[in-house]
Amino acid sequence: MALVLLIKGHVYNMKKTILFLQILLLILFSGGCSREIKPDQDPTEREFSVQSLAKGDIDNVLDIHVHEVRKLLRELMGKLYKRNPKQLKKSPFNDIDKNISRVFDKHHDWSFKQLDFKEGVDAIKMTFDDAYHGDRVFSFIVGLSSMLMASYGDKTDFYMLDKVDGQVLYNSARNIEIAVWKLSNNRDEQGQLFLYSNSLPNEEAYLSYERLFGKLVANQDTIAIIMESKNKRLIKKIFQNMATAVFLPI
């Protein structure tokens, strides 16, 4: 009798293991290698699915951090358009919400003809290039967003088989700081800032941008530390003079 129960228990455990492996394979092959970004969805409001069984605690933490990053970027894009209405007029959509939607609510792979298909730090650099005459808010946000998403492996939904590099997350936080410095200091041929963000001289202090960027940096640094601990790989700290700083690899 004991032997029968032992065999039944062994068979049951094997079935559970096979089911778990099937779920992992389903997730792995359904995800493929696509870089396509999906519309935003709050991970705390998702309904239970079979795929949820293949998530660990760290995966849920990653889901939440990515969602927070994209939420902050949406808010930042709206504020920059309000502060720089001339840039909105250069957009094919003379509407803030439509511009935000095409970046964060549509399926795409960050390849926008309007930006000569540039993304990441290349799109950020375009924002501060006199030769570029397009919508600088769009180039800045697409560049920043695609750079940050690349630090998460271009995923918004994580499972046990997914790998995220703490060093890359750390690098992305430093790149945000470099982008912020350029936003506040780089000027065009006429001596004007390429994009206005915080208050100008003789204006009342306006620090909402600093708070948003601070939250973005803190988010990336926090998850970088978490992944450093999980992966047991030390992050190499990098210090640069902002005036001569170069963007770090992602």
Per-segment meaning from a language model:
Residues V11-L21:
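Bacterial N-terminal signal peptides that target proteins for export
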Residues K90-Q220, I238-F239:
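Mature extracellular/secreted ectodomains of secretory-pathway proteins
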Residues M1-N13:
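N-terminal amphipathic/basic-hydrophobic helices that include classical n-h-c signal peptides
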Residues S34-R136:
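N-terminal Sec/ER secretory leader and immediately downstream segment
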